[in-house]
């Protein structure tokens, strides 16, 4: 009989979002007429920006001609897209990131998982708690952890708490870690990292020869001009960080699929006594395992940076952040303790009356027909918290707030 990857058996009962779907399905089967409002999974709801749609339509027509047809594209992404990303997202902010250091992909979730392909299993790893579950689960799947304890913490991983007690700041650890996952603006808490905090992290990483995996998928939602959008705004980050970005939330590409990862050419790792270039390893990995993002989609992503695209993206981001403000202001006025929802599209709510995260999930589902995300699904430090997403229509967000406020 064929042998399986037994590391998958270490995973807790189910990935957070499939478990949410299971409970919704069970509830809906018993209550088929319930008008559910979903503020749980962070999927966008508004249409693709017009500039992106028009660019993709033109690309489709181009592909229908003999001269314009394109087959396999470069695994790293088309040069014209990488150049426009470099100029707009990095050089314009004082970051020394070239087009060659940008790898276009079909999702930051995929990249933050696949990056483990080029990193050794002996690395000492730290994650924040609460944490985006993908960071943890992919380390489990690839044999980098032991079993989970009763609260879901895996042996072999170290957890850095970010909570109301420490101002949702990821404190610099005293121990040495080889690999550190940071996500700011943070999913799920909505917290941000100041320039001073990121300077401290880069200093720590350089002193300890550590690698920071920096998830900046929500950088477009930052309102505070003092908050960095990229870790590469910090001097020295080129020597100790990889950054993941996505068009999913700012441009509505969750179903279209386009993202990118930045790996500076100056970034190094160790293989025994040999010093190795991480850029070359990732380039080799992508060339072997990835066929690239479609030409049509990349033309749509390129349009994000056009004059019209920038205006439309700004409007789209503002729409979702207005939703976040509606959530935060209504729940705060009703007596809930609410964090985030200022520089990120997520509100992180303290559950009332010491309810557990899943009990509050079931309570809102049954009493208000509103779906959110239990904080405990993001780690032990998320117990007693609940995440609501701003990704929905204005009508649904306002209706959901009316229902929840009535329950308080």
Swiss-Prot record:
Pathway annotation: Amino-acid biosynthesis; L-lysine biosynthesis via DAP pathway; LL-2,6-diaminopimelate from (S)-tetrahydrodipicolinate (aminotransferase route): step 1/1
Enzymatic reactions: (2S,6S)-2,6-diaminopimelate + 2-oxoglutarate = (S)-2,3,4,5-tetrahydrodipicolinate + L-glutamate + H2O + H(+)
Top-level taxonomic group: Bacteria
Location of N6-(pyridoxal phosphate)lysine modifications: 249
UniProt xrefs under InterPro entries: Aminotransferase_I/II_large (IPR004839), DapL/ALD1 (IPR019942), PyrdxlP-dep_Trfase (IPR015424), PyrdxlP-dep_Trfase_major (IPR015421), PyrdxlP-dep_Trfase_small (IPR015422)
Summary of subunit composition and partner proteins: Homodimer.
Function: Involved in the synthesis of meso-diaminopimelate (m-DAP or DL-DAP), required for both lysine and peptidoglycan biosynthesis. Catalyzes the direct conversion of tetrahydrodipicolinate to LL-diaminopimelate.
Protein name: LL-diaminopimelate aminotransferase
Gene source species: Prochlorococcus marinus (strain NATL2A)
Lineage: Bacteria, Bacillati, Cyanobacteriota, Cyanophyceae, Synechococcales
Gene that encodes the chain: dapL
């Amino acid at each position: 009989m064929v042998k399986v990857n037994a590391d998958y058996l270490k995973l807790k009962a189910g990935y957070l979002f499939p478990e949410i779907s299971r409970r919704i399905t069970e509830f809906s089967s018993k209550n088929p007429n319930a008008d559910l409002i979903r503020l749980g999974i962070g999927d966008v709801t508004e249409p693709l920006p017009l500039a992106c749609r028009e660019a993709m339509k033109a690309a489709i027509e181009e592909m229908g001609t003999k001269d314009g047809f394109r087959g396999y594209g470069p695994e790293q992404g088309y040069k014209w897209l990488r150049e426009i990303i470099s100029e707009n997202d990095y050089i314009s902010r004082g970051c020394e990131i070239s087009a060659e250091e940008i790898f276009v992909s079909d999702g930051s979730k995929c990249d933050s998982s696949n990056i483990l392909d080029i990193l050794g299993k002996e690395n000492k790893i730290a994650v924040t708690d609460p944490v985006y579950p993908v960071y943890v689960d992919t380390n489990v799947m690839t044999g980098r952890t032991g079993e989970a304890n009763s609260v879901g913490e895996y042996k072999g991983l170290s957890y850095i708490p970010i909570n109301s007690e420490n101002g949702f700041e990821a404190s610099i650890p005293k121990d040495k870690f080889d690999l550190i996952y940071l996500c700011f603006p943070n999913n799920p808490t909505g917290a941000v990292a100041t320039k001073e905090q990121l300077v401290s992290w880069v200093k720590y990483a350089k002193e300890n020869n550590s690698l920071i995996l920096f998830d900046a998928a929500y950088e477009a939602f930052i309102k505070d001009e003092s908050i960095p959008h990229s870790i590469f705004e910090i001097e020295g980050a080129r020597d100790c960080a990889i950054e993941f970005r996505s068009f999913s939330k700012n441009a509505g590409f969750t179903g279209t699929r386009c993202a990118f990862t930045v790996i500076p050419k100056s970034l190094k790792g160790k293989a025994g006594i040999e010093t190795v270039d991480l850029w070359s390893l990732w380039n080799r990995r992508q060339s072997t395992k990835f066929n690239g993002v479609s030409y049509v989609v990349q033309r749509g992503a390129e349009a994000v940076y056009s004059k019209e695209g920038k205006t439309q993206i700004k409007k789209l981001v503002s729409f979702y952040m207005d939703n976040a403000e509606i959530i935060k202001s209504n729940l705060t006025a009703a007596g809930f303790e609410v964090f985030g929802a200022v520089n990120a599209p997520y509100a992180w709510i303290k559950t009332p009356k010491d309810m557990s995260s899943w009990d509050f999930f079931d309570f809102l589902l049954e009493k208000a027909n509103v779906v959110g995300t239990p904080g405990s699904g993001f780690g032990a430090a998320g117990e007693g918290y609940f995440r609501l997403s701003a990704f929905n229509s204005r009508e649904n967000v306002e209706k959901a707030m009316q229902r929840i406020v009535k329950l308080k």
